């Protein structure tokens, strides 16, 4: 049986491996580090003495690729969220609190209810989102949503920046339309916010590795790809050159490179790919005890300060700041002080931060999702017949999210299966 070689065991690579293994194909997965998951993983932090996620990820029940992936690997019950959609917000400038509550049906009755929408907004304000349907690749988020409008700072900007990890006045609006269409556009049933109950590895990584291992797929850690060798006619790859040796490819073998854009650019010389990236800063605080149930909202959007979103899991409070280029340049102590100041107000806690805190900076979290970057997103198929590409930065039509990463892996697998490679 032909072998499919998948290089990169992040979410995209795992998605490809799971899809191909599910279809009964023989796969080998290579990962340069000693763990799978890439930017989507959990680890034990010695400072906090707790398992924490490398980054916080908010998912929606309408993320179909995520849900299908979790179902295949047996982790469909590993996410948690409200029974009905509810998005809590806190405004640091006015100290107002509110909760956006979409109704379950497709028609958005909720925008006609003052108690279910953003304070100061009217039902007609939400119709701005329809303009996303006609957004061109050059259209910015701020071209669609008026920055001076009542919804921008309190709803559209937090949503856009968290999804695109790019400032709203630089971000490509076109990427938001499929996100809204597949979630909020289908009604509240598909827009329930979900987070990993225990951690990202427990939901997305460990069950996938178990599934692959039980199915006979091979996984090699510490395998760093240096280069690839092409056949004499240049139409196919003939070998993968790893630091510890070469892997010769059989005539019917295929390869999926599920690597970050900068890494892939070093291996496939001359291939265009997005070069500009934006960081994400996550800060984790360990409390002396879990919050009281009244205050223990799983997550909350924060506007008017440094923090974008905060997440609560047992005695750990985690915050995320997207497109955090300026914040990422600050010292650990400055970041802790700035983010805790927001948390203390949002959750009504003391002004002094807990002694146990951990700052995690992901300096190249995603590519800058700007109009200039969109044409540089790679297609699944390449000039080499037996080479496919995957990764959240490839041209999925979606932003660089977990949903996009899983779809990219599935697309690479589908390309192989449909060609009977």
Residue ranges of each PLM-predicted region?
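Mid-domain catalytic core of redox enzymes
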Residues: 223-350, 377-381
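Glycine-rich FAD pyrophosphate-binding loop
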Residues: 21-46
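N-terminal Rossmann-like FAD-binding beta1-loop-alpha1 element of flavoenzymes
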Residues: 2-29
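Mobile amphipathic helical/loop "lid" adjacent to a hydrophobic cofactor/ligand pocket
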Residues: 63-181, 190
């Amino acid at each position: 049986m032909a072998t499919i070689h998948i290089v990169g065991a992040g979410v995209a690579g795992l998605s490809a491996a799971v899809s191909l293994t599910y279809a009964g194909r023989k796969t080998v997965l290579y990962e340069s580090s000693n763990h799978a998951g890439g930017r989507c993983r959990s680890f034990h932090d010695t400072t906090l003495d707790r398992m924490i996620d490398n980054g916080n990820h908010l998912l929606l029940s309408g993320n179909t690729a995520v849900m299908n992936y979790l179902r295949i690997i047996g982790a469909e019950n590993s996410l948690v969220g409200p029974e009905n959609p509810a998005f809590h917000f806190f405004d640091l400038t006015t100290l107002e609190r509110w909760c956006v509550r979409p109704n379950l049906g497709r028609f958005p009755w909720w925008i006609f209810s003052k108690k279910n929408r953003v304070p100061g907004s009217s039902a007609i304000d939400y119709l701005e989102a329809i303009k996303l349907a006609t957004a061109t690749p050059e259209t910015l988020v701020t071209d669609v949503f008026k920055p001076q409008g009542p919804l921008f700072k309190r709803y559209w900007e937090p949503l856009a920046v968290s999804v695109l990890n790019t400032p709203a006045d630089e971000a490509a609006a076109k990427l938001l339309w499929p996100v809204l269409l597949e979630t909020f556009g289908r009604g509240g049933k598909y827009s329930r916010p979900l987070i990993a109950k225990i951690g990202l590895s427990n939901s997305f990584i460990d069950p996938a590795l178990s599934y692959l291992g039980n199915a006979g797929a091979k996984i090699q850690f510490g395998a760093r790809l240096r280069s690839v060798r092409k056949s004499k006619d240049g139409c196919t790859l003939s070998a993968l050159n790893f630091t510890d040796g070469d892997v010769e490819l059989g005539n019917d073998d295929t390869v999926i490179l599920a690597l970050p854009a900068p890494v892939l650019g070093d291996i496939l010389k001359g291939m265009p790919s997005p070069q500009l990236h934006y960081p994400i800063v996550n800060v984790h605080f360990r409390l002396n005890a879990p919050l009281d149930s009244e205050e223990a909202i799983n997550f909350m959007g924060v506007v008017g300060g440094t923090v974008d979103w905060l997440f609560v899991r047992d005695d750990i409070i985690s915050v995320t700041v997207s497109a955090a280029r300026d914040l990422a340049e600050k010292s650990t102590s400055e970041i802790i002080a700035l983010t805790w100041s927001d948390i203390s107000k949002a959750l009504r806690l003391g002004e002094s931060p807990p002694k146990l805190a951990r700052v995690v900076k992901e300096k190249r979290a995603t590519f800058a999702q700007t109009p200039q970057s969109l044409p540089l997103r790679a297609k699944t198929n390449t000039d080499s017949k037996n080479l496919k590409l995957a990764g959240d930065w490839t041209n999925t039509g979606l932003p660089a999210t977990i949903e996009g990463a899983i779809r990219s892996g599935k697309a690479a697998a589908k390309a192989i299966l449909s060609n009977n490679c």
